């Protein structure tokens, strides 16, 4: 498939960027006085980056289906898909952790 390598690197790049933003957001959420507006922006940017990765992933799947090469194994594609899937899991888990940190912060302020 033509351009597969470039698409894989696009998926890897956007997924990695999303994971970095998510780690920064969760770290910031544990600060003494977290800026939840900035944290929400990081979460949005991570989601947006993942949407780009998912769109590229869908193109690869579509191209595989149309070309009949769907059973071909490409290690770079497997790595790209793994990076995207782990970023999606990060998004789900760290979003919940940030919500928990926010609730803990509210409880601390009441004490």
Enumerate the predicted regions with their spans.
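Terminal alpha-helical segments
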Residues: 1-111
């Amino acid at each position: 498939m033509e351009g597969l390598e470039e698409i894989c690197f696009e998926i890897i790049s956007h997924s990695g960027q999303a994971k970095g933003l998510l780690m920064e957001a969760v770290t910031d959420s544990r600060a003494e006085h977290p800026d939840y507006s900035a944290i929400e922006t990081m979460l949005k940017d991570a989601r947006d980056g993942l949407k780009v990765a998912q769109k590229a992933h869908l193109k690869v799947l579509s191209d595989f289906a149309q070309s009949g090469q769907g059973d071909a194994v490409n290690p770079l594609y497997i790595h790209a898909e793994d990076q995207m899937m782990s970023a999606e899991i990060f998004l789900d888990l760290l979003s919940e952790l940030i919500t928990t940190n926010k609730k803990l912060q509210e409880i601390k302020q009441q004490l």
